[in-house]
């Protein structure tokens, strides 16, 4: 999503427009490195996660190209996706769980461009995040102070692709 390659399979990407892509959150490193750092810092926990479990999620906010074309193009799309990014922060539980967020402004809508006889671009927002759920860790029967058994010991943000993240129509 960061457009760091020299060429792409998608022939509708216009490299000269890549500078118009809007980064709401630029990754500070590779996703795996960022994940490991967040785990080391205690921001997230992988306690109980299976080795083959998904560790990343992606939200894609995508609206018909005609909508932006009819409402002001690039500037309108920037404002629209600024608001969408604010929604993404709420959806994932906080900006600290977002690794990357970029609005692509460099993809040409071929069909619409040909129909109108001018370049029309397809604006959309990619948000890569770490899916987490709040989990309460409780004192167990092995605790020396029996009055604590069953009470919340700590609350962690556990990496999880639980039903919370299931796609809904």
Question: In which residue ranges do the predicted regions lie?
Answer:
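N-terminal nicking endonuclease/strand-transfer module with a His-rich metal-binding environment
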Residues: 1-169
């Amino acid at each position: 999503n960061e457009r760091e390659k020299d060429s792409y399979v998608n022939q509708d990407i216009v490299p000269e427009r890549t500078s118009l892509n809007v980064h709401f959150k630029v990754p500070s490193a590779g996703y795996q490195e960022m994940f490991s750092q967040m785990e080391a810092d205690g921001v997230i926990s992988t306690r109980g996660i299976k080795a083959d479990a998904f560790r990343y999620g992606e939200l894609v906010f995508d609206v018909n190209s005609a909508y932006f074309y009819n409402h002001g193009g690039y500037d309108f799309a920037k404002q629209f996706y600024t608001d969408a990014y604010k929604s993404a922060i709420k959806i994932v539980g906080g900006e600290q769980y977002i690794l990357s967020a970029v609005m692509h402004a460099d993809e040409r809508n071929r069909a619409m461009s040909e129909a109108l006889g001018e370049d029309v671009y397809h604006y959309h927002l990619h948000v890569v995040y770490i899916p987490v759920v709040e989990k309460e860790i409780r004192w167990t029967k092995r605790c020396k102070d029996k009055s604590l058994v069953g009470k919340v010991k700590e609350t962690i943000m556990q990496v999880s692709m639980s039903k919370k993240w299931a796609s809904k129509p």
